Design a protein with these regions (language model features):
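Generic, ordered loop/turn and secondary-structure boundary motif
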Residues: 12, 26, 44-45, 66
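Helix-rich interaction surfaces within compact, conserved domain-sized segments
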Residues: 65-101
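Generic structural hydrophobic/aromatic packing signal, biased to beta-strands
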Residues: 23-25, 35-37, 60, 85
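Negatively charged, low-complexity tracts enriched in Asp/Glu with abundant Ser/Thr
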Residues: 1-34
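Short amphipathic alpha-helical "recognition" segments used for binding
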Residues: 23-25, 50, 70
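A short, structured beta-strand/loop element
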Residues: 39-63
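Short, highly charged low-complexity linear segments
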Residues: 14, 49, 80-84
Length: 101
């Protein structure tokens, strides 16, 4: 038997307009990246980055790009592939905003 919606304890349930950039590129490693990069009012200005080919998504800001091994872990990349993705995302992610605290 399914759960009635009144049985859920929602932490939040909101809708908002977002902006999504779709981009596909290949670097020196010959790894093809097909990404959807979503900008939202959530996540302190970080971007929601989705690898469309593999169905993996991460919330990424400049601090995440500096975290050693993070992109390799999240997107299952080699070190060379992660370096290429980092080089691209450094141009995209911008700064983190803590305006909603």
């Amino acid at each position: 038997m399914g759960m009635d919606i009144s049985q859920f304890d929602f932490l939040y349930d909101t809708s908002e307009e977002t902006k999504t950039r779709f981009v596909s590129f290949i670097g020196d490693s010959m790894k093809r990246f097909d990404l959807a990069i979503t900008s939202s009012n959530r996540f302190y200005g970080k971007k929601l980055v989705t690898d469309i080919q593999h169905g993996k998504t991460a919330i990424i800001g400049p601090d995440d790009l500096e975290a050693e091994g993070y992109l390799e872990y999240v997107f299952k990349l080699t070190e060379e592939e992660a370096a290429e993705l980092t080089a691209f995302l450094e141009q995209v992610v911008g700064t983190v905003n803590f305006t909603d605290i």
